[in-house]
Design a protein with these regions (language model features):
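Low-complexity basic/metal-binding stretches
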Residues: 5-6, 25
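Terminal helix-turn-helix DNA-binding modules in bacterial transcription factors
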Residues: 10, 14, 19-23, 42-84, ...
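Helix-turn-helix
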Residues: 26-33, 37
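Short hydrophobic/aromatic patch on the recognition helix
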Residues: 36, 40, 85-86, 90
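C-terminal interaction modules of eukaryotic adaptor/scaffold proteins
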Residues: 91, 102
Length: 111
């Protein structure tokens, strides 16, 4: 992994709760959008936008288990403007709704 990839990833990790564009990510490594895409694909086998989506979903999963915040609030905290889209993407990634995920993992912790 090169320094430019690390710079882009650090930016995503720091600002994932905000509205981030491919241009914002590319600017962090002082590269064009197409170069940012190529670097991500080469070293991370992913696109910056998809990496951001996965990171947001992973952070939301952590918040579901470690806080009692409502799903809508968590969705907003991790950068989703639309809770329905958040729930759809969460279910696609984790194969269950955010509420089901919370119930499963909180119950698991009580066993």
């Amino acid at each position: 992994m090169c320094i430019r990839d690390r710079l882009m990833m650090q930016y995503i990790h720091k600002h994932f709760g905000e509205k981030i564009s491919l241009e914002d990510i590319a600017e962090q490594a002082v590269v064009s959008k197409s170069t940012a895409l190529n670097l991500f694909r080469r070293y991370l086998h992913d696109t910056p936008v998809h990496y951001l989506l996965k990171y947001r979903l992973q952070e939301s999963a952590s918040l579901l288990v470690t806080t009692q915040k409502k799903v809508m609030v968590i969705a907003q905290n991790v950068g989703f403007e639309n809770v329905d889209y958040f729930c759809k993407m969460f279910k696609k990634y984790y194969k269950m709704t955010p509420t089901e995920y919370r119930e499963k993992h909180i119950t698991k912790g009580l066993d």
